[in-house]
A protein has these predicted regions:
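N-terminal cap/lid segment of alpha/beta-hydrolase-fold proteins
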Residues: 2-50
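Membrane-topology and secretion signals of cell-surface/extracellular proteins
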Residues: 35-37, 52-55, 71, 108
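Generic structural signal for alpha-helix termini and adjacent loop/cap motifs
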Residues: 44-45, 61, 117-118
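Short beta-strand element of the alpha/beta-hydrolase
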Residues: 49-62
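Phosphate-coordination loops involved in phosphoryl transfer and adenosine-cofactor binding
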Residues: 51-52, 125-127
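A fold-wide structural signal in alpha/beta-hydrolase
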Residues: 54, 79-89
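Catalytic nucleophile-loop/oxyanion-hole region of alpha/beta-hydrolase
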Residues: 66-74, 88-125
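Gly/Ala-rich beta-loop-alpha elbow adjacent to hydrolase catalytic centers
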Residues: 131-132
Length: 132
């Protein structure tokens, strides 16, 4: 029995396309050259001096999945409300030899990256929320 329908797969492909159309920033670079990106859904007309609130989304499931597209609808909706939606990549057990604590640490590092780059991104560092 297939858990996901063809429509589910089509939606995921569409969300991944929308994700790739957003501004992407390298938030983590490894010694082997691999990079992890963070995609930001900015509010329409966003300017760096705006200091917008933001939500940092963590995708995945059971530390295995790599479902970057899961939060695209939420990020799009929030951007229309004046809130930036940020979807960072991070390593999961499905693709890397990492443990759940490694993944949690990367989540903390992603939050620290957003907080440390808030002025550059036009975000308010006091209004960064985490969801996932």
């Amino acid at each position: 029995m297939e858990l996901f329908t063809e429509a589910d797969h089509l939606a995921e492909a569409r969300y991944r396309k929308l994700l790739r159309e957003q501004p992407g920033f390298v938030w983590r670079r490894f010694s082997d050259g691999e990079e992890l990106m963070a995609y930001v859904f900015f509010p329409p007309g966003h300017r760096a001096e705006a200091a917008a609130p933001s939500v940092l989304f963590f995708h995945g499931g059971m530390w295995v999945g790599k479902s970057l597209g899961d939060f695209v609808p939420w990020a799009l909706h929030l951007a229309q409300q004046g809130i930036a939606g940020i979807i960072p990549m991070f390593r999961t057990r499905g693709d890397y030899e990492v443990e759940p604590m490694d993944i949690l640490e990367e989540g903390r590092e992603a939050w620290a990256w957003v907080h440390g780059n808030a002025a550059l991104l036009g975000l308010d560092p006091a209004r960064i929320t985490v969801a996932g």
